[in-house]
Amino acid sequence: MANLFISESENQLSNKYLKDGYIIVDIQDIKSLDWIRQFYIRFIKNYLNQDLSNKDILNNFHKLIKIKDLNNFRLKLIQEVNKNKNFRKNYFNVASPFLNEIVGNELVMQNRVNLSIQLPNDKSSLLDVHADTWSGDSPFESVVWLPLVDCFKTKSMFILPALKYKKITKLFQSSKFK
């Protein structure tokens, strides 16, 4: 039965999300994305106390910080992100058109924004097989991962197909990992 209240594109997006468990979409609110990028760039410059060019600072961040200093940087940045009254608004604006389409408009956003930074050859920051539900989060939440740079080759995140995810979940739940 056709739903008279949603467009065909919304229906396709919802069906893809239900089938695959995720969607990858192009950002529509570039202004909010740029605001977030500029926030990070300003923080990096202040934290490192260097007058760096904005042009490639995010793409070359791995050349600016040592792996041993990354966690302190990340924790300080998370603190600043969550102190800023405009950050959550801009973060939500980036994702809201798609969230509204896949889960509806009755949304709740977590109080704190989190952050993962992974540098080349940094084994300490890797997110192995990751699912928020394994750490006690609701299986009914939608998580937004927002890359701040163009992602390609090894500069990207791999998402398991649903069938493989189910196999790995069973493995983690088995006694082999307890």
Per-range role (PLM):
Residues I24-I27, L107-R112, V143-P147, S156-I159:
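A structural signal for short, well-ordered beta-strand segments and their strand-loop junctions
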Residues S125-K178:
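Catalytic core of non-heme Fe(II) oxygenases with the double-stranded beta-helix
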Residues M1-I102, E106:
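N-terminal auxiliary "cap/dimerization" subdomain that precedes the catalytic jelly-roll/cupin core
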Residues N11-K16, Y22, N111, L127-V129, ...:
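Broad hydrophobic/π-residue packing in well-ordered secondary structure
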Residues R88-A131:
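Hydrophobic alpha-helical segments and helix pairs
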Residues I27-Q28, V113, Q118-P120, D132, ...:
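Structured loops at beta-to-helix junctions and adjacent beta-edge loops in soluble globular domains
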Residues N3-L4, Y40, G104-M109, V113-I117, ...:
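Generic preference for hydrophobic/aromatic residues in regular secondary structure cores
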Residues Y17-L18, V103, V108-Q110, D122, ...:
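A generic structural signal for short, non-catalytic loop/turn and secondary-structure boundary residues
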